Swiss-Prot record:
Glycans are attached at residues 132, 209, 242, 253-254, 282, 303. Residues 93-177 form the Saposin B-type domain. Disulfide bonds join 97-173, 100-167, 128-140. It comes from Dictyostelium discoideum. Residues 69-83, 301-342 have a biased composition (Low complexity). Residues 345-355 have a biased composition (Basic residues). This is Countin-like protein. Residues 1-27 form the signal peptide. InterPro entries: SaposinB_dom. It is found in: Secreted. Residues 63-83, 290-355 are annotated as: Disordered.
């Protein structure tokens, strides 16, 4: 099967999928999301070329690769690169490259397992027939026919094979000899924000020599925890010209983003960044700053109590004064004239004393 016939088959499959509400050209987005999730879930070290230098002041450890789960808030937006000259979205590369990358992003481990277990298989239809779905079998067979079964199965026993390199070996993706790009500027806006803010990372670059399919890697370093967030954006290829690519990075309002400066590094790679088969086209670093307002301290109630006034007895204490007792003057007792009058006088005196 020649390449033009394979392109026709893929075009028919694409039309069929579009009719079934399945957009095969969304391979760029799907590949990027799947690849990012796969790398983060495996929590593997990202292997950048040794010539990439990180400023020692950032104290970054590449071995601590994590996708901050608050970055589920970081939607994996695939902002396509735009040509600064025409303003049109870049759509380079043959349909074979997009389909191949999307297909192998899902089925490369399966094909590696099939070929490892069954050994040399004499036909493309037998290798691909071990897949489960008709569409995948057709795409696999078409890719296999591009290079022939003898070359096809050997690709999947190559050490550290990845979808980009496999698609280049299959000839579905172009392999320019001297891809080159210059970075013009990298901006982050706003330059200063609070935790929970969204920051727009905007890269402007110039492609000097045509590139093949590759990736942008947007890396935000969390200096507090010595970890990082990585987002990959796939591109099919660029012809010479000026372009820009953007990525929205959303922070979270928690202890990850304390006050301080956060480095943002962008890599552009021909192929899959960090692998032995990729070419680093360029890199640059910028920063944004988190500046949260200082919380106003809440006044603490004092433990000292207001003294309670002691009530004073306003009623004066009566002063006891002795009432002088008059001593009755003894008067001569008249001589009773009769006994009855004497009794009456004695009784009256007794009563007066008892009162």
């Amino acid at each position: 099967m020649n390449k033009s016939l394979f392109s026709l088959i893929l075009l028919i499959i694409t039309i069929f999928n579009l009719a079934s509400n399945i957009n095969i050209v969304s391979a760029i987005s799907n590949f990027n999301i799947n690849n990012n999730n796969k790398n983060n879930n495996d929590n593997k070290e990202i292997r950048f070329p040794t010539d990439i230098i990180i400023d020692d002041s950032t104290e970054i450890n590449f071995n601590n690769h994590e996708d901050n789960n608050n970055n589920n808030n970081n939607n994996n937006n695939n902002n396509n690169a735009y040509n600064e000259d025409s303003g049109n979205s870049v759509q380079l590369g043959d349909i074979e490259c997009v389909v191949c990358l999307d297909f192998l992003d899902s089925y490369l481990p399966t094909l590696v397992k099939i070929i490892s277990e069954y050994g040399v298989i004499e036909s493309c239809s037998k290798i691909c027939g071990l897949l489960n779905k008709t569409d995948e079998i057709d795409i696999c067979t078409g890719l296999c026919d591009l290079v022939g079964v003898d070359t096809f199965w050997k690709i999947f026993v190559t050490n550290d094979i990845n979808p980009f390199y496999a698609c280049e070996l299959i000839t579905a993706c172009s392999t320019p000899k001297n891809p080159a790009a210059d970075f013009i500027s990298l901006g982050v806006s706003p330059a200063i924000g609070q935790s929970g803010s969204k920051f727009l990372i905007d890269l402007t670059f110039q492609v000097v020599n045509t590139t093949g399919a590759g990736q942008f890697a947007f890396i935000v370093f969390y200096t507090q925890t010595q970890s990082k967030f990585i987002n990959y954006q796939l591109f099919e290829g660029f012809s010479p010209g000026n372009y820009s690519v953007k990525y929205d990075f959303e922070t979270t309002n928690n202890s990850t983003f304390i006050n301080g400066q956060y480095p943002v590094t962008v890599y552009m790679c021909n192929g899959e960044c960090g692998t032995m088969y990729s070419t680093l086209l360029n890199q640059t670093t910028s920063y944004f700053t988190i500046s949260n307002p200082t919380p106003t301290p809440t006044p603490t109630p004092s433990n000292s109590t207001t003294p309670t006034p002691t009530p004073t007895n306003s009623t004066p204490t009566p002063t006891s004064t002795s009432t002088p007792t008059s001593t009755p003057t003894s008067t001569p007792t008249p001589t009773p004239t009769s006994s009855s009058s004497t009794k009456t006088h004695s009784s009256h005196y007794k009563n007066k004393i008892n009162k």
